[in-house]
Amino acid sequence: MALAALAVPWIAALVLDRDWTQVSGPPVRVAILQGAIPQDMKWLEANRETTLELYAKLTREALGEPLIVMPESALPDLANNLVPYLGRLYNEASARGSALVLGLVRASDDGSNYFN
C-alpha cells in the first residue's frame, strides 16, 4: 500500500508532462476590462448609468486590441434592455478592429426565465 502511495506522484508527473494543446497561430492580445464595482452596488438602479458609462469608457480605452473581454454580468441590466448600448459599443469596436466578448444576463421572451 505504501509503495502504491509513493508511485502515484511519479505516475501523475509522467502523465501530466504532456502537451494537451497545440499552438495554432501567433499569440492574440486581449484586453480584459475590470470595473471593480461591488456586486451589491452595481445592480442598484441608482448606479446603473454610472456603471454603463464606466464600461463604455474602459471599452473605448481598449479599442484597437483584437479582443476585448468584459467579466460575466459586468453590465447591470438584461441584454434585452441594452440593445442600443451594445450596438454602439459593437460599432465602435468593429470600426477599430476589435471584437467584444461579454457575459450578459438575458430574459426569456415571456420574462419568466433568466439566462447567463
Region roles according to the model:
Residues A2-D19:
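Internal/C-terminal transmembrane anchor helices
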Residues L14-N116:
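Soluble catalytic regions of membrane-associated enzymes that act on cell-envelope
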